[in-house]
Design a protein with these regions (language model features):
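Phosphate/dinucleotide-binding and metal-coordinating scaffold of catalytic cores
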Residues: 1-186
Length: 186
């Protein structure tokens, strides 16, 4: 199920379509995720909407995500944001896009993040690679938006993924995990 950003986006999207988000069941929400969710799971019937549009104005979308996070705004880009990642998990605003034939997850800043969070996350990814951690390609888009090549897809298949919070049954909204908890997963 979408959480954080994904739930907020889905609820706003449903409202602009004239649907009360509190009146749809969990199964109906899963049908709206359909084949567009993260990882290997797909849900039928599939009522998901996605876009194959390659070129997005990331700066405009970042501004729109700020409005959505801080107000009840449901403006021009809401449908674009929904179609490019409305089913995604996690708390931060993000989009899934195809650029030069590669599928990317590009993250935007959440309200409590430092202004340069994209650059920070990108530098962490470079450090992880220097330490020998095998991870997908990363990139800093337009100098400020962290992107990672989709790790839940290969050319021919989908890859199951699960978050540490999911494995440990931890509430992702409340910082409650430390490195000791993560090491227990190993």
């Amino acid at each position: 199920m979408p959480d954080g950003w994904g739930s907020l986006l889905l609820d706003r999207y449903l409202r602009i379509k004239g649907i009360d988000p509190y009146k749809i069941s969990l199964l109906q929400r899963l049908a709206l995720i359909g084949s567009t969710g993260r990882g290997a799971l797909e849900y039928s019937p599939d009522f998901s909407e996605s876009s194959n549009e390659e070129i997005l104005n990331l700066n405009k979308l970042a501004l729109e995500t700020e409005k959505i996070l801080t107000t009840d705004y449901s403006g021009d880009s809401l449908e674009t944001l929904y179609k490019h990642g409305g089913s995604s998990g996690g708390a931060r605003p993000k989009v899934f896009v195809t650029i030069d034939g590669k599928e990317w997850l590009i993250k935007f800043r959440a309200m409590n993040d430092p202004i340069n969070v994209g650059e920070i996350e990108y530098k962490y990814s470079l450090l992880a690679k220097k330490c020998g951690i095998n991870m997908p390609e990363t990139k800093l888009f337009e100098g400020k938006y962290f992107g990672v090549e989709r790790y839940d897809r290969t050319k021919d298949s989908r890859v199951h993924t699960v978050s540490a919070a999911g494995l440990l049954n931890a509430d992702y909204r409340i910082p409650s995990l430390d490195y000791g908890d993560l090491l227990q997963l190993c």
